[in-house]
Each structure stands twice: as structure tokens, then as C-alpha cells.
């Protein structure tokens, strides 16, 4: 790899720096970063001799024999700045035939949320605990793994009265937390870092504000820093939900349209597709007003985007790592598509001497809402 780029590999139940022999055996690395509530995953390909003890260690630990948790952490240092790509666990190990006494080992895994699906505790009661406190209680079990909870209570975060209802957990920890998030229109995911061996467990609304990443530049000759960048405008993807409140005296349903603009999800495009499709959420009539609003906001957030982009870049040309779940600027794509976008997915593809990223972008409409983007 180039001298300005360094790949760090940490393995073990408590992640420690891998020996130089193992790091030199890495031939390819692939890391997938999503958005929303999607899990991150990784795939590491190693070239090891047939009789190497490291080959046996990976097969035993990845298969769950003897080692309860094969933790894998990947970091990248670019121009003196270190970032964690993934902090997860190996879930699958494959062997591929090679030549000259060398075989390939492919280690696949997911972030630490995969560990939350291992053990189920059905029927665990949470008396008088609102959803946010239930999430904190569940995540406390993973503090020893460096999981740092970041939980934002919703407007419907009301503790149930024990004389009326006692919530109980159904299914494993991950599925139950995701269910609680979906009920109020939130997302739940684990993000590696800031330090090796730590991960942030975020349970809250999807955030589309903050300082944008340096602009992706296309069609500007020597200033271009992407290899490809394409855009698509799909007006049928945008939908406006209508929730129903039940009037207490007459029991008549009152329809209320919910916009897709919130303080944490401001418009990134000046001209959205009009008129949007209307979607009636009839199942909200029996909910309380805060719960119905959260359902509407969640639906609106999922169906607010109509402009989509995808492309590929060379990290050394871009000068830093592009990360998902953040904003990024675009310039050189023309008046309808320039401006700020939300990064939905990023796929890191690392090989000896090359570091590529494939990405997808999204926003709510055409034409930028800002006069310029940071470079």
C-alpha cells in the first residue's frame, strides 16, 4: 500500500494488534457500511500456507469451537488520521484452494450487533420502564465489550403503569431493540470507535444535519476526485403519510398530513417532486397522539428521498475516507444535482496498492439549498 495509508488489524476476545505475519497475509478487505438500522459487515481474505497454525486458529475460532468470541477490529490510518472501519465478530470462515502450498482463508463477519442475536431472554419483564430505559438496560450487558450507549428518548417515551401493563422482552436483544426503535420511528445501529475496542450503540432518530464531508467533484478535469458518479430522479419514491387521531367524544377519525421535514431532517433539495403520493396510515387511529405522530414521522423519513446517486472513488485521490450516515457535498454534476447529500451506503474495498470506495447518496429534491459546499 502507499506509504500514507496503513491498515490496522486487531483480533481476539479482547482485540489486540495482530502479529506482523498475519497482517502481511491479508490480500483483500471488504467492509460494508449502511444507513438506517442496517448492520455493517466485513470480509477479510488471507493467503496462508496450508500448514500454517494461523489457518487452524481461524477455522477453530470462526466456527465457535473453544473460542466464544472471535472479535475483529479494522482501522485505517490515512495521512496521520486513524479511523475504525469495523468492530465486530467473525461469523463464518471459508477455505479456498490455492497454488504452491498457499490456501486462502476468507473470514466473514458483522458488527457487534450480531452478538446480540446469540442469546434470547424471552419473558424478561421491564416494569414501569419506558422504551429508552429498556434499551439502556439491555445495552448495559455489553459494556464489557466497549459498547457505549447513545440513547435519545422519543416524545412517546412514557413509562407504562404496572397495574395496567408490564412490558416483557420477546426474542433476542437485537430484535427487541429494533422493534422498540421501529415503534417510534427510530433507528438502531452500532458504529465503531472512537478508540479501538469501543463501539457506539445509537438508538434515536436518523440525523441528517452536521458538518458535511469534503465535496465529491466530477466533470472538473484535474479537480475531479471521483472515478464515476451517476444520478437518478425518481418522483414516485416520495410519499406523504396521513395519520389519524380519534376524537374522544364522537370517536371520529381526524386525518392529519405529516411532512417529511424535521429539525433533524431538513430539506437538502429546494424543489421536491409535487404532488407527492398520499399514503393513509389507518392503523394509527388507535394510538395516542405522540405515538401516531412518531409513526407518521418514521414513514415520512423512509419515503422522503427522490434524488439518488451512486459512484466510486479512489481514497488516495479523495484524500480521506468517505463515511456513511453523514452529509457530503457534490459539485460539477450540474445545477439540478449539485449540493448536499446524505450518504446511505459505503463499501470499502482494500487491496495491496489500492483503496476504492463505492457509495450511494440520497436527498429529497432537485437543486441545492446551499450556495456552496466545502471542498
How should these model regions be labeled?
Residues 55-60, 96, 117-120, 147-150, ...:
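Sec-dependent N-terminal signal peptides of Gram-negative outer-membrane/periplasmic proteins
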Residues 14, 47-49, 77-79, 89-96, ...:
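Solvent-exposed coil/turn segments that connect beta secondary-structure elements
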Residues 104-107, 111, 151-225:
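Short beta-strand-centered interaction patches in the first periplasmic/extracellular domains
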Residues 28, 41, 84-89, 106, ...:
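Well-ordered beta-strand positions in beta-sheet-rich domains
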Residues 1-116:
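Assembly/oligomerization scaffold segments
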Residues 19, 117-126, 174, 178, ...:
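Surface-exposed, non-catalytic interaction/assembly patches
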Residues 43-44, 109, 119-150, 166-191, ...:
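Amphipathic, non-transmembrane alpha-helical segments in extracytoplasmic/periplasmic proteins
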Residues 37-65, 223-375:
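An acidic/polar, Gly/Ser/Thr-rich interaction patch typically located in mid-to-C-terminal regions
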Amino acid at each position: 500500500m502507499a506509504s500514507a495509508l496503513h491498515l490496522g488489524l486487531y483480533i481476539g476476545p479482547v482485540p489486540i494488534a495482530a502479529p506482523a505475519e498475519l497482517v502481511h497475509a491479508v490480500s483483500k478487505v471488504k467492509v460494508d457500511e449502511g444507513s438506517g438500522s442496517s448492520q455493517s459487515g466485513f470480509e477479510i481474505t488471507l493467503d496462508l500456507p496450508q500448514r500454517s497454525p494461523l489457518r487452524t486458529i481461524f477455522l477453530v475460532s470462526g466456527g465457535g469451537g473453544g473460542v466464544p468470541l472471535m472479535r475483529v477490529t479494522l482501522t485505517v490510518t490515512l495521512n496521520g488520521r486513524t479511523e475504525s472501519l469495523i468492530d465486530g465478530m467473525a461469523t463464518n470462515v471459508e477455505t479456498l484452494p490455492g497454488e504452491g502450498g498457499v490456501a486462502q482463508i476468507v473470514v466473514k463477519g458483522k458488527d457487534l450487533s450480531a452478538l446480540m442475536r446469540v442469546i434470547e431472554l424471552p419473558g424478561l419483564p421491564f416494569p414501569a420502564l419506558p422504551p429508552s430505559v429498556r434499551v439502556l438496560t439491555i445495552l448495559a450487558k455489553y459494556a464489557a465489550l466497549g459498547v457505549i450507549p447513545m440513547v435519545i428518548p422519543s416524545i412517546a417515551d412514557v413509562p407504562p403503569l404496572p397495574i395496567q401493563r408490564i412490558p416483557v422482552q420477546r426474542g433476542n436483544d437485537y430484535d427487541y431493540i429494533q422493534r422498540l426503535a421501529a415503534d417510534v420511528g427510530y433507528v438502531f445501529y452500532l458504529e465503531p470507535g472512537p478508540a479501538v475496542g469501543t463501539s457506539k450503540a445509537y438508538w434515536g432518530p436518523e440525523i441528517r444535519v452536521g458538518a458535511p464531508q469534503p465535496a465529491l467533484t466530477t466533470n472538473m478535469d484535474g479537480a475531479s476526485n471521483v472515478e464515476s458518479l451517476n444520478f437518478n430522479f425518481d418522483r414516485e419514491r416520495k410519499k406523504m403519510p396521513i395519520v389519524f387521531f380519534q376524537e374522544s367524544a364522537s370517536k371520529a377519525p381526524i386525518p392529519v398530513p405529516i411532512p417529511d421535514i424535521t429539525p433533524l431532517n431538513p430539506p437538502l433539495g429546494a424543489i421536491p417532486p409535487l404532488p407527492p403520493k398520499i399514503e393513509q396510515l389507518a392503523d394509527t387511529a388507535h394510538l395516542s397522539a405522540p405515538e401516531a405522530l412518531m409513526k407518521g414521522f418514521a414513514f415520512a423519513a423512509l419515503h422522503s428521498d427522490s434524488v439518488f446517486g451512486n459512484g466510486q472513488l479512489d481514497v488516495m485521490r479523495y484524500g480521506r475516507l468517505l463515511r456513511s450516515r453523514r452529509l457530503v457535498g457534490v459539485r460539477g454534476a450540474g445545477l439540478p444535482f449539485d449540493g448536499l447529500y446524505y450518504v446511505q451506503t459505503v463499501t470499502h474495498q482494500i487491496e495491496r496498492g489500492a483503496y476504492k470506495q463505492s457509495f450511494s447518496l440520497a436527498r429529497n429534491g432537485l437543486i441545492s439549498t446551499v450556495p456552496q459546499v466545502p471542498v
